[in-house]
Every structure is written in structure tokens, then in C-alpha cells.
Amino acid sequence: MESFFNNTFATLIAYIGIIFTYLLVIPLLLFYWMNNRWNIMGKFERLGIYGLVFLFFPGLILFSPFLNLRLKGSGKG
């Protein structure tokens, strides 16, 4: 079991998992959360979301050309 933890392959897999989570999974969850709750968030929830946006900014930048958070208007004009 000790040789598994000293293995370079296991370390590489761990890094890939962390990077995948940091750059892809959590930013997509943040986009989904903000898109669904933007108009009904409380002040502490909004403060927490702003903190998470600051923390996961690199991943959000990766998705920003493809996703947007434009509010849906009345459709007139």
C-alpha cells in the first residue's frame, strides 16, 4: 500500500482530478446556481456566491464565451 502513495501515476491522477474539479465542475455548478437564483438570493447567499466567484474565477473565465447570465426580459421591443 505504501508503494501506491509514492507512485508518480497516483500523484498525476490526483492532480488531474483536482484540476478537473477546480476548472470544470465547480464553475459549471456556480453558473447554474447563479442563473437560477439571481433574483431571489439573500444578501448572505450573494456574498457567499461572490466569494466563490472570486475563488473559482479561472474556471468561470473558461466558460464565459459559451455561457451568459443575461436576465430574461419581457420580450418586448
UniProtKB/Swiss-Prot annotation:
Enzyme class (EC, first level): translocase
Alphabetically ordered keywords of this record: Membrane, NAD, NADP, Plastoquinone, Quinone, Thylakoid, Translocase, Transmembrane, Transmembrane helix, Transport
EC number: 7.1.1.-
Alphabetized GO MF terms: oxidoreductase activity, acting on NAD(P)H, quinone or similar compound as acceptor; quinone binding
Residues spanning the membrane: 12-32, 47-67
UniProt subcellular location: Cellular thylakoid membrane
A Pfam match: NdhL
Chief subcellular location: membrane
Catalytic activity: a plastoquinone + NADH + (n+1) H(+)(in) = a plastoquinol + NAD(+) + n H(+)(out); a plastoquinone + NADPH + (n+1) H(+)(in) = a plastoquinol + NADP(+) + n H(+)(out)
Membrane topology: Multi-pass membrane protein
CC annotations in GO: plasma membrane-derived thylakoid membrane
Record family assignment: Belongs to the complex I NdhL subunit family.
Subunit composition and interactions: NDH-1 can be composed of about 15 different subunits; different subcomplexes with different compositions have been identified which probably have different functions.
Function: NDH-1 shuttles electrons from an unknown electron donor, via FMN and iron-sulfur (Fe-S) centers, to quinones in the respiratory and/or the photosynthetic chain. The immediate electron acceptor for the enzyme in this species is believed to be plastoquinone. Couples the redox reaction to proton translocation, and thus conserves the redox energy in a proton gradient. Cyanobacterial NDH-1 also plays a role in inorganic carbon-concentration.
This protein's name: NAD(P)H-quinone oxidoreductase subunit L
Organism of this sequence: Prochlorococcus marinus (strain AS9601)
Gene this protein is translated from: ndhL
